[in-house]
Regions:
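Short acidic, glycine/serine/threonine-rich loops at helix termini
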Residues: 86, 108-112, 137-138, 145-146, ...
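Short beta-strand elements
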Residues: 49, 180, 186, 366-371, ...
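C-terminal catalytic domains of large/alpha subunits in multi-subunit enzymes
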Residues: 235-236, 398-404, 433-439, 468, ...
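Helix-loop-helix junctions that connect adjacent transmembrane helices in secondary transporters/permeases
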Residues: 307-396, 561-628, 648, 771-780, ...
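Signature of N-terminal electron-transfer/Fe-S-associated modules in redox systems
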Residues: 1-162, 612
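Thiamine diphosphate
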Residues: 411, 415-436, 440-442, 645-649, ...
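Flexible, low-hydrophobicity surface segments
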Residues: 149-322
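Glycine-rich loop/linker segments at domain edges
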Residues: 93, 171, 177-183, 321-367, ...
């Protein structure tokens, strides 16, 4: 007789005869999804639950060990505790992507039950085993403290805050997704189960063990004979076997006889009725390889006798033949850098290297696909629904009918650029269409670490010059990126690294050469900062070296060269009226000078929007459904809060309370394409489209109050940031003050007016032109706008980071609750990049696990001061917002480097830095 294991889950006695991880029992048998599967190795804490009142990670506890225990998940917490955490986390801005949040709640609730008045240090210790990649922990610590105060009766829940009657731009907006994320009720793709999709099957790829090897034979016969196996797909089952975001060079599966390009290349896709059978079947697949010598790095890739990874690739409708391992190159010039540097009073030259780094988002990649109409529907976690549709349709050979693939973006548990490429979406779609069954395909944490694109490793040499007074004269540099086995977004990332290598300063002579090389390392692509973290680390470190030669301090040389409105950036673009770099420098001036020998400083700029002449439209449709304005824009909220921003835009334009506004499904079937969540673009680009649609709605509401009928047909218009037209060619008139938050005109009774517009639709497209890279115009407009920042890092007497002052010009602050957490999270990510994070490779094979990536934990965080600057004169689009997502990370690493140089006189040009207290701790770990 099988042994039985009995325990209590949320007050209900449960018995099972199967000994397996408790996390799997909770999720698979009981359909309790608040406990998340972030790593299944006890490293991340997303599965934290209570066992006899103590916070425990469910992935390391088995059902046998749980016997006789009392188990509680978020669903089983007392209602007053649940409500306290919903309010507290929403009020302080503790929720971003949300994947870590139920685990944080459980860790915090266990602490409060033990000590109702915990200190900050106690809270940090209680969540030491829980990773948050978004917030930098500070807001979570504040949230747990506030929840404790609410439960003690010292603080009251402000119900008005969540209700959102005053939800406009610049107001403290309770994020729209807080409640469902805190309580674990929101659905990420892995939370879709057999109750949602009857007959759900499970798919996973058998992946290459070698970075470069010829696949001699593939034998799937034993796996196919295993009961419960639904099907096994190979390269010959793929209509078009190469996909890619921009360049189609990424094999869906490696065919027999072909050569693998990196560890993790898919060779066969196994589909089974359940996950246990799936794992058994994968082990029965036999693949014979002929291992080949890999191309390990840039030096080997450049060698004359290096094996060529790709003979050609397909991009933008053309086949490109390759002569070597250069995937992409860029050359950005202005003025005469060689002459300027030769005539400079001072110059400095230095080589810098930065490593591959891992996004470490908490949610591993997952997608569910099922047959739908004459094609397939994919429910996924990614950063761009239409991009995923395009890649999947290309794989099927449906480039001319991409609508046969419908993509719905579910909740996304963090991205930071790492979910721009397809990972499992196309595999799930292929299996669902071929086998005519619903299919879930997800990556294990180990597969995710090995497979998805990383931040590019850089090897670059930079030369910067100035005159005798410290005014910059010119920059020359060569930037070399290791893009790994596939292009991913090598071209655009390399381009941003080159165009931003000049920094936010006022000089005009630059010569910047960039190269991205194919190697047999796992691919590199987009990562928060999009190439700028690498080049700005080099430039800002050089500036301190140059300042020393001139005899200026680090703050003064930056202030002397800082760009101001009306001045010309090194790329030729004229700085717009909202530019506030000098203001950010002034905000941190006192902190810098108060800590001589312990302070480092760095500045940065970062574009908003794709720019450089590429079409980058924001699109929005507002439809009135059940008396509410439902906002449809196929944009992915990966934690940055754009879905809340869009509702704030509507509230600001129309005067509506939150109860009359909602987000629609983010689906290619129902929502217009508003581009990828990348390039800090959503607040500006889609935000302006939402505002435009909201103005059309507001006009119709005015009409209702004036006794006019509701529009009989959809109302649509478009604008370019300077003028607006209805789609029938009529000009749209708008008073200039209405572009400023707080100065618009609203209907007298917005809630009543909107009810009379039931079923009406209002659409807007925003497309502001920019100039191509290298455009032959005196002052090319490369991007819609730029954000600016200055960070100061303070070291204590032991050389540890004690404080960070992060001053940001992000234009109009749309949601004050959200911006601080965005800045704090970006700063901590930048600190990790500088000091602790690494993703080591040995002969192209990844060596790290999630727990060894060097991520900062809560007890290690410094005091981060998030400062934002708002000028009186702002851009006219999107109420003046410019985005904060990427720039918060960029200046931190060079500020850390400059702090250490001030501290001990040593230059540390290679990341992660060595010879710091953090590097010693990392080596001990």
């Amino acid at each position: 007789m099988a042994q039985e294991f009995t325990f209590t889950v949320n007050g209900v006695e449960r018995t099972t005869t199967e000994n397996k991880p408790l996390l799997r029992y909770l999720r698979d048998d009981l359909n309790i999804h608040s406990a998340k599967d972030g790593c299944s190795e006890g490293a991340c804490g997303t599965c934290t639950i209570h066992v006899d009142g103590a916070a425990v990670k469910a992935c390391v506890l088995t059902t046998a060990l749980a016997a006789g225990r009392n188990i509680v998940t978020v669903e089983g917490l007392p209602e007053d505790v649940r409500e306290a955490f919903v309010y507290a986390f929403g009020a302080v801005g503790a929720v971003q992507c949300g994947f870590c949040i139920p685990g944080m709640v459980m860790a915090g609730a266990a602490l409060i039950a033990e000590d109702p008045e915990p200190t900050e240090e106690q809270i940090k210790y209680a969540i030491r085993g829980n990773v948050c990649r978004c917030t930098g922990y500070k807001k979570i610590i504040e949230g747990i403290s506030l929840a404790a105060a609410v439960l003690r009766g010292e603080k009251q829940i402000d119900e008005d805050l969540e209700r959102g009657d005053d939800y406009g731009v610049g107001k403290r907006a309770f994020r729209i997704d807080v409640r469902k994320k805190v309580l674990g009720e929101g659905k990420y793709p892995d939370d879709i189960d057999e109750l949602d999709q009857p007959g759900l099957t499970y798919a996973s790829a058998v992946r290459s063990k070698y970075p470069r090897a010829r696949v001699l034979s593939i034998d799937t016969s034993k796996a196919e004979a295993l009961p419960g196996v639904v099907g096994i797909l190979r390269a010959e089952d793929v209509p078009v076997n190469q996909v890619g975001h921009l360049i189609q060079d990424w094999d869906v599966m490696i065919a027999q006889g072909d050569i693998t390009r990196c560890v993790g290349d898919a060779i066969v896709l196994v589909v089974a009725e359940d996950e246990a059978t799936l794992e058994k079947a994968k082990k029965l697949v036999k693949i014979d390889y002929e291992p080949l010598e890999p191309v390990r790095n840039i030096v080997e890739a450049r060698a004359e006798d290096a094996p060529r990874l790709h003979d050609s690739f397909f991009a933008f409708g053309n086949t490109v033949e390759l002569k070597d391992n250069v995937c992409q190159s860029r050359h950005v010039t202005r003025g005469d850098a060689a002459k300027a540097l030769a005539e400079s009073a001072f110059t400095v030259t230095q080589r810098f290297t930065t490593p591959f780094t891992e996004h470490a988002f908490l949610e591993p990649e997952c997608a569910v696909a099922f047959p739908y109409k004459n094609g397939v529907k994919v429910q996924s976690t990614d950063q761009g629904a239409y991009d995923t549709r395009k890649e999947c349709a290309h794989m099927f050979g449906w480039d001319n009918e991409p609508e046969r693939v419908v993509v719905e973006t579910m909740l996304v548990g963090g991205g930071f650029g790492g979910k721009e490429d397809v990972s499992v979406q196309h595999l799930a779609a292929l299996a669902a269409y071929k086998l005519q069954r619903p299919v879930k395909c997800k990556l294990t944490r180990a597969e995710s670490l090995a497979f998805h694109p990383k931040r590019h490793a850089m090897d670059g040499t930079f030369t910067l010059g100035c005159d005798a007074e410290g005014n910059f004269t010119g920059l020359d540099c060569e930037i070399n990126f290791d893009t790994g086995a596939y292009a991913s977004l090598c071209g655009p990332v390399l381009e941003r690294a080159c165009t931003h290598a000049v920094g936010p300063y006022k000089y005009q002579n630059t010569d910047i050469r960039g190269f991205g090389y194919y190697t047999n390392n796992p691919p590199a692509g987009a990562f928060r900062g999009f190439g700028v973290c690498q080049s700005e680390f080099a430039l800002e470190s050089l500036i301190d070296l140059l300042a020393e030669k001139v005899g200026l301090d680090s703050w003064e040389i930056r202030y002397r060269n800082a760009i101001e409105p009306g001045e010309v950036l090194p790329n030729g673009q004229i700085a717009d009226c909202s530019t506030a770099l000098k203001e950010t420098l002034l905000e941190v001036k006192d902190a810098y000078y108060a800590h001589p020998g312990h302070a480092g400083i760095a500045c940065a700029m970062k574009n908003a929007g794709v720019g450089v002449g590429l079409p980058d439209a924001g699109r929005c449709k507002i439809r009135i459904e059940d008396g509410r304005a439902v906002v449809y824009a196929a944009t992915s909220d990966i934690g940055q809060g754009c879905n809340t921003v869009f509702l704030q835009d509507v509230a600001e334009a129309c005067g509506l309370p939150l109860s009359c506004i909602a987000n629609g499904e983010c689906s290619t079937e129902n929502a217009p394409d508003s581009g990828t969540t990348s390039g800090s673009r959503q607040t500006v680009v889609t935000g302006e489209a939402v505002r435009g649609a909201a103005f059309l709605l507001r006009d119709a509401m005015f009409g209702i109050e004036a006794g006019k009928p509701a529009p009989a047909a959809p109302v649509s218009a478009h604008g370019d940031g300077a003028k607006i037209e209805y789609d029938d060619g009529r000009a749209y008139q708008l008073r200039s003050q209405e572009l400023i938050a707080g100065q618009g005109m609203h209907p007298q009774d917005p809630a009543a007016a909107i009810k009379a517009l039931e079923g009406c639709e209002f659409s807007y497209v925003y497309l502001e032109p920019t100039d191509k890279l290298g455009a032959d115009v005196p002052n090319p407009k490369s991007h819609i706008c730029y954000g600016f920042a200055t960070h100061v890092v303070i070291l204590d007497d032991n050389g540890r980071v004690s404080e960070v002052y992060a001053a940001h010009d992000s234009g109009k602050v749309v949601n004050p609750i959200s911006i601080q957490g965005q800045i704090e999270g970006g700063v901590l990510m930048g600190m990790g990049y500088a000091l602790t994070e690494d993703w080591p490779l040995k002969d192209c094979v990844p060596q790290a696990r999630y727990g060894t990536l060097g991520l900062f934990r809560a007890p290690e965080i410094p005091d981060i001061h998030a400062i934002y600057v708002e000028k009186d004169e702002l851009l006219p689009v999107a109420y003046g917002g410019k985005g904060i997502g990427e720039i918060a990370t960029i200046p931190t690493a060079p500020a850390v480097q400059n702090a250490y140089r001030a501290f001990d006189g040593k230059l540390r040009p290679d990341l992660p830095m060595v010879d710091t207290p953090y590097s010693r701790a990392r080596h001990r770990g």
